[in-house]
Protein backbone atom coordinates (compact mmCIF):
# COMPACT_ATOMS: atom_id res chain seq x y z
CA UNK A 1 0.00 0.00 0.00
CA UNK A 2 3.02 2.31 0.30
CA UNK A 3 2.78 3.19 -3.41
CA UNK A 4 -0.86 4.35 -3.23
CA UNK A 5 -2.45 7.48 -1.85
CA UNK A 6 -4.62 7.04 1.20
CA UNK A 7 -8.26 7.51 0.13
CA UNK A 8 -9.85 10.65 1.53
CA UNK A 9 -12.53 8.59 3.29
CA UNK A 10 -9.79 7.40 5.67
CA UNK A 11 -9.51 10.99 6.92
CA UNK A 12 -13.21 11.44 7.75
CA UNK A 13 -13.48 9.81 11.19
CA UNK A 14 -10.17 11.37 12.35
CA UNK A 15 -11.37 14.82 11.22
CA UNK A 16 -14.57 14.45 13.26
CA UNK A 17 -12.53 13.11 16.17
CA UNK A 18 -10.15 16.11 15.98
CA UNK A 19 -13.11 18.51 16.06
CA UNK A 20 -14.65 16.67 19.01
CA UNK A 21 -11.30 16.65 20.80
CA UNK A 22 -11.13 20.42 20.27
CA UNK A 23 -14.52 20.92 21.91
CA UNK A 24 -16.41 21.12 18.61
CA UNK A 25 -13.89 23.06 16.52
CA UNK A 26 -10.23 22.89 15.59
CA UNK A 27 -7.64 24.69 13.52
CA UNK A 28 -5.85 23.01 10.65
CA UNK A 29 -2.63 22.47 12.63
CA UNK A 30 -4.54 20.56 15.33
CA UNK A 31 -6.27 18.50 12.65
CA UNK A 32 -2.88 17.74 11.02
CA UNK A 33 -1.50 16.44 14.32
CA UNK A 34 -4.58 14.28 14.88
CA UNK A 35 -4.41 12.83 11.34
CA UNK A 36 -0.70 12.00 11.62
CA UNK A 37 -1.36 10.24 14.92
CA UNK A 38 -4.25 8.11 13.64
CA UNK A 39 -4.03 7.57 9.86
CA UNK A 40 -1.28 5.22 8.57
CA UNK A 41 0.05 7.53 5.84
CA UNK A 42 1.88 5.91 2.94
CA UNK A 43 5.19 6.99 1.43
CA UNK A 44 3.23 8.34 -1.53
CA UNK A 45 1.10 10.47 0.82
CA UNK A 46 4.28 12.21 1.98
CA UNK A 47 5.42 13.07 -1.57
CA UNK A 48 5.29 16.70 -2.55
CA UNK A 49 2.02 17.70 -4.19
CA UNK A 50 2.76 18.53 -7.86
CA UNK A 51 0.39 21.52 -7.81
CA UNK A 52 1.35 22.85 -4.38
CA UNK A 53 4.99 21.90 -3.75
CA UNK A 54 5.07 23.03 -0.13
CA UNK A 55 2.33 20.56 0.81
CA UNK A 56 2.38 16.77 0.97
CA UNK A 57 -0.19 14.89 -1.11
CA UNK A 58 -2.13 13.86 2.01
CA UNK A 59 -2.85 17.53 2.75
CA UNK A 60 -4.82 17.68 -0.52
CA UNK A 61 -6.72 14.49 0.34
CA UNK A 62 -7.54 15.93 3.76
CA UNK A 63 -8.70 19.22 2.23
CA UNK A 64 -11.01 17.30 -0.10
CA UNK A 65 -12.45 15.30 2.81
CA UNK A 66 -13.11 18.52 4.74
CA UNK A 67 -14.71 20.14 1.67
CA UNK A 68 -16.93 17.07 1.25
CA UNK A 69 -18.02 17.43 4.88
CA UNK A 70 -18.77 21.13 4.33
CA UNK A 71 -20.95 20.22 1.31
CA UNK A 72 -22.72 17.57 3.41
CA UNK A 73 -23.39 20.09 6.17
CA UNK A 74 -21.38 18.06 8.70
CA UNK A 75 -18.65 20.69 9.15
CA UNK A 76 -18.67 24.47 8.77
CA UNK A 77 -15.90 27.00 8.40
CA UNK A 78 -15.27 28.56 11.77
CA UNK A 79 -12.71 31.22 10.89
CA UNK A 80 -9.49 31.22 8.89
CA UNK A 81 -8.18 27.63 8.55
CA UNK A 82 -10.55 26.53 11.31
CA UNK A 83 -13.59 24.26 11.17
CA UNK A 84 -16.40 23.41 13.52
CA UNK A 85 -18.96 20.64 13.85
CA UNK A 86 -22.55 21.43 12.95
CA UNK A 87 -25.49 19.78 14.72
CA UNK A 88 -25.57 17.31 11.84
CA UNK A 89 -21.83 16.70 12.32
CA UNK A 90 -22.32 15.95 15.99
CA UNK A 91 -25.14 13.54 15.07
CA UNK A 92 -22.86 11.80 12.53
CA UNK A 93 -20.12 11.53 15.17
CA UNK A 94 -22.63 9.91 17.56
CA UNK A 95 -23.91 7.59 14.83
CA UNK A 96 -20.36 6.40 14.16
CA UNK A 97 -19.79 6.09 17.92
CA UNK A 98 -16.94 8.61 17.90
CA UNK A 99 -18.61 10.07 20.97
CA UNK A 100 -20.96 8.40 23.44
CA UNK A 101 -24.32 9.76 24.54
CA UNK A 102 -22.54 10.90 27.70
CA UNK A 103 -20.01 12.91 25.67
CA UNK A 104 -17.08 10.51 26.11
CA UNK A 105 -14.77 10.58 23.08
CA UNK A 106 -13.59 7.43 21.33
CA UNK A 107 -10.14 6.23 22.37
CA UNK A 108 -7.54 6.96 19.67
CA UNK A 109 -6.32 3.35 19.69
CA UNK A 110 -9.88 2.13 19.03
CA UNK A 111 -10.29 4.74 16.29
CA UNK A 112 -7.10 3.46 14.60
CA UNK A 113 -8.41 -0.10 14.87
CA UNK A 114 -11.81 0.78 13.33
CA UNK A 115 -10.46 3.17 10.67
CA UNK A 116 -11.15 0.86 7.70
CA UNK A 117 -14.71 0.20 8.91
CA UNK A 118 -15.38 3.94 9.28
CA UNK A 119 -13.88 4.63 5.84
CA UNK A 120 -16.26 2.13 4.21
CA UNK A 121 -19.26 3.82 5.83
CA UNK A 122 -18.08 7.27 4.80
CA UNK A 123 -17.59 5.95 1.25
CA UNK A 124 -21.34 5.24 1.18
CA UNK A 125 -22.00 8.87 2.10
CA UNK A 126 -19.74 10.11 -0.69
CA UNK A 127 -21.44 7.97 -3.33
CA UNK A 128 -24.71 9.68 -2.48
CA UNK A 129 -23.18 13.16 -2.63
CA UNK A 130 -20.73 12.87 -5.50
CA UNK A 131 -22.93 10.81 -7.79
CA UNK A 132 -26.51 11.94 -7.18
CA UNK A 133 -27.66 10.84 -10.64
CA UNK A 134 -25.96 7.42 -10.53
CA UNK A 135 -29.32 5.74 -9.88
CA UNK A 136 -32.15 6.66 -12.20
CA UNK A 137 -35.49 5.35 -10.92
CA UNK A 138 -37.51 3.38 -13.42
CA UNK A 139 -40.64 5.22 -14.56
CA UNK A 140 -42.17 2.43 -16.65
CA UNK A 141 -43.63 0.31 -13.84
Q: Where are each of the predicted segments found?
A:
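A short, conserved structural fragment
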Residues: 70-80
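Positively charged, polyanion-binding regions of nucleic-acid-associated proteins
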Residues: 2-29
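Solvent-exposed, charged helical/coil patches
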Residues: 133-141
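Short helix-capping/hinge SLiMs at alpha-helix to coil transitions
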Residues: 19-24, 37-41, 78-79
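Minor-groove-contacting beta-hairpin "wing" of winged helix-turn-helix DNA-binding domains
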Residues: 81-87
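Short, amphipathic alpha-helical interaction segments positioned at domain boundaries
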Residues: 88-132
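An amphipathic alpha-helix signature
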Residues: 28-32, 36
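Short, positively charged loop/turn segments that connect secondary-structure elements
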Residues: 4-6, 36-63
Amino acid sequence: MSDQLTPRQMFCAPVLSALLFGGGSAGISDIYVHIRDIVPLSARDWESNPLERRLARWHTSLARAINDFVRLGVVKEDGHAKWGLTEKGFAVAKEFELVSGDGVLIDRALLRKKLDEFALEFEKMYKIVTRPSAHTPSTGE
